[in-house]
Amino acid sequence: MATTTTTTRATAVAGARIGGGAAARSRREAVLRVVAPVAVGLIVLGAWQFLVSVVGVSDYLLPSPASIVEEFVAYWPSILSAAIITGTNALVGLVAGTILGLALAALAARWRAIDLMSAPVVAAIAVVPIVALAPVLNSMFGADSQFGRQAIAALASFVPVFVNTLRGFRQTAPVHRDLMKAYAATSGQVLRTITLPTARPFMLTGIRIASSLAVISALVAEYFGGPRGGLGSLISTSAASSAYARAWAYVVASIALGLLFYLATLLLERLVQPHRTQPHRTGGGAR
């Protein structure tokens, strides 16, 4: 009896140590995820300032971080207004591209003929250069319309959402579908209980990738014409007038906008899949 009690206590202590070690490791990883990017950023900024202040790189080639911050503060109202315009274009394009990608992927997964017809179209859209498409759409929809930019963002968002969602729909094991059919489940029940839960991580991965592409495509579309006011057009105007520090300030705002979209999709992923601690990766399975 004493031996059994001792063994039980030893097992409990060992389990507590393992649990405590896992919790400590999790805390270290959480701290590292925050500290590592900050440390890298500080190192890059320090090297940047060193090149300008000590090495003597011209502001024409590389403005100093201090001058960029000064321009950022001085033109903050303009930066905020431009970020709202660009963010709206990117958001509209992201939503439209996501809806179109999800719908077409569902149809392609359901009917083989649609899959065969859509494959070359999606491949063609994926290789269309935004630099060539932006002036065309801006001219088609007029110099005062934002629709051309939103359409470009939608096309850029559509491809990753479609590809990842279609792959997710195809991950459902046939044995699971057969089992549901054996229980006389309807197509809607199979979709709700088997197909969608399996495909959800892939959908979210596609949306996360598309969020960054939507911002990039909106910026590029603004850079090549259309109504003024977005971050892309202000970068072009500032660079053309040799206000390079100001142009870099708009670039910093563009980076912040892209990060905001990315973090928003990460938050969406955490809300939709609260038990997942890591973002889903296209190259691997769910964790």
Show the residue positions of the predicted features.
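Periplasmic/extracellular loop-to-transmembrane helix junction in inner-membrane transport proteins
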Residues: 21-26, 54-95
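Short cytoplasmic-facing helical segments at TM-TM junctions of multi-pass membrane proteins
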Residues: 164-203, 232-235
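C-terminal transmembrane helix and the adjacent membrane-cytosol boundary/short C-terminal tail
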Residues: 112, 170, 248-287
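Short, Lys/Arg-rich, polar N-terminal cytosolic tail immediately upstream
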Residues: 1-29
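Generic hydrophobic transmembrane alpha-helix motif, especially the helices
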Residues: 123-160, 167-168
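Transmembrane-helix boundary motif in ABC transporter permease subunits
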Residues: 92-122
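N-terminal signal-anchor transmembrane alpha helix
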Residues: 28, 32-54
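Transmembrane alpha-helices
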Residues: 151-155, 188-221, 249
